[in-house]
Swiss-Prot record:
Protein name: Probable pectin lyase C
Keywords, sorted A to Z: Carbohydrate metabolism, Cell wall biogenesis/degradation, Disulfide bond, Glycoprotein, Lyase, Polysaccharide degradation, Secreted, Signal
Subcellular location: Secreted
Coiled-coil region(s): none
Disulfide bonds: 81-100, 90-220, 316-324
InterPro entries in the cross-refs: Pec_lyase, Pectin_lyas_fold, Pectin_lyase_fold/virulence, PEL
One GO-annotated biological process of the protein: cell wall organization
Signal peptide (residue range): 1-18
Catalytic activity: Eliminative cleavage of (1->4)-alpha-D-galacturonan methyl ester to give oligosaccharides with 4-deoxy-6-O-methyl-alpha-D-galact-4-enuronosyl groups at their non-reducing ends
Glycosylation site list: 123
Gene from which the chain derives: pelC
Source organism, top-level taxon: Eukaryota
Family: Belongs to the polysaccharide lyase 1 family.
Keyword Repressor: no
């Protein structure tokens, strides 16, 4: 029996953490509980918020306003560079780890807070109330083996968008059992999502809006380039019902030995390319829709990619226990990759359900991101 798309999104809507989390993670992060059923805390100041998230105790934290970190840690003026020129909409770059190389030197001033994310600890739930939960000028950092964390219905924005290396929204550097749901990321200096050089396992990123509309970019226009840099050894990511919009690259850069299951996600308005990466990255894309994407992936990608179609959908049974849903396209480049050698790597992982690509296109852009949790209440 074919399950309606909305029902797929809401299969576990009755399960909640302390009555503030809606739904439950599907895919690789199934079973995550975050802070559990303890009494929620409602921080009023930046200091209270950071203290709660960086504490060693389980916490359920509810955001009811914008927490503005811009200017709270001062600014830095130093030599940076102009890899793409100094035009009004061109990103400049911070010389992190000598990245600038021989590019033209320019003097830059950037905000320090955005470069140093909040180091969230294990057993945490962070949820925004309505559309009010915003982190401005500060991202979230998951490292050192932290686990069992839920982040739902928040927005992260204003991370030095004029400067490469200015700030990442979500950084994962050795984390496990993480669910990022109904979040919006925008105006980042660098990546919306980045995984580092330690394994990041059992992660589900779902119903998120990766908003690439920006003030400065590597293309000197309003399309953000640095979207998702996935380079961890053994990363496991379910990418479900997300909307990647108005970007030009690294959507994702699928490298390391990342295992990436993209299901019912939508890529739209991308004049550059979407998928790139190194030779050991592994990605299965099913039930996804590509709308106005000039290049979805290289014709001969370095990484291992499988794009589901009506012709090859049945071959997914060995990996997913079911046939795949075919991807859909409108005014986009070809995506004919059909590598199946990595399918055995799905063994033991929880697989997200999938609906059709056309249903994803109709539903996901209108219902992803902050302030749209009520979709499952009907």
């Amino acid at each position: 029996m074919k399950v309606p798309f909305l029902q797929l999104l809401c299969l576990n809507a009755a399960l909640a953490s302390a009555n503030v989390v809606q739904g439950a993670a599907q895919g690789f992060a199934a079973g995550v509980t975050g802070g559990g059923d303890i009494t929620p805390s409602y921080p009023k100041t930046n200091e209270e918020l950071v203290s709660l998230l960086e504490s060693d105790e389980p916490q359920v934290v509810v955001l009811t306003k914008t927490f503005d970190f811009i200017g709270t840690e001062g600014t830095t003026t130093e030599d940076g560079c102009a890899p793409w020129g100094t035009g009004k909409s061109c990103q400049l770059a911070i010389n992190s780890n000598g990245w600038c190389g021989k590019n033209p030197v320019v003097t830059i001033t950037y905000d320090n807070a955005a470069k140093n994310g909040i180091h969230i600890k294990s057993n945490k739930t962070l949820v925004g109330e309505g559309d009010k939960g915003v982190l401005s000028g500060k991202g979230l950092y998951f490292e050192g083996g932290v686990s069992n964390i839920i982040v739902q219905n928040i927005k992260i924005t204003n991370l030095n968008p004029g400067f490469v290396w200015g700030g990442d929204a979500f950084t994962f550097f050795g984390a496990d059992l993480i669910w990022i749901d109904h979040c919006e990321t925008s105006l980042t200096g660098r990546q919306h999502y980045v995984t580092g050089f330690h394994p990041n396992t059992r992660m589900t990123w779902s119903n998120n809006f990766l908003n690439g509309v920006t003030t400065h970019s590597a293309g000197c226009d309003d399309h953000h380039y640095w979207t998702m840099e996935l380079v961890g050894p053994g990363d496991e990511i379910t990418f479900q019902n997300n909307y990647v919009y108005h970007t030009t690259g690294r959507g994702p850069a699928l490298s390391g030995t990342t295992l990436f299951h993209a299901v019912n996600s939508v890529w739209s308005s991308i004049p550059g390319h979407a998928i790139e990466g190194g030779d050991k990255g592994r990605g299965l894309f099913e039930g996804c829709f590509f709308e106005d994407v000039v290049e979805i992936a290289p014709a001969k990608p370095e990484n291992q990619l499988f794009s589901a179609s009506e012709a090859n959908a049945a071959s997914c049974k060995s990996a997913l226990g079911r046939a795949c849903q075919a991807n859909g396209y409108s005014k986009s480049g070809a995506f004919g990759s059909s590598e199946t050698g990595f399918f055995k790597d799905f063994a033991g992982l929880t697989i997200a359900p999938a609906g059709s690509a056309t249903d994803a296109l109709a539903y996901v852009p209108k219902n992803c991101g902050i302030g749209r949790l009520e979709s499952c209440d009907a």
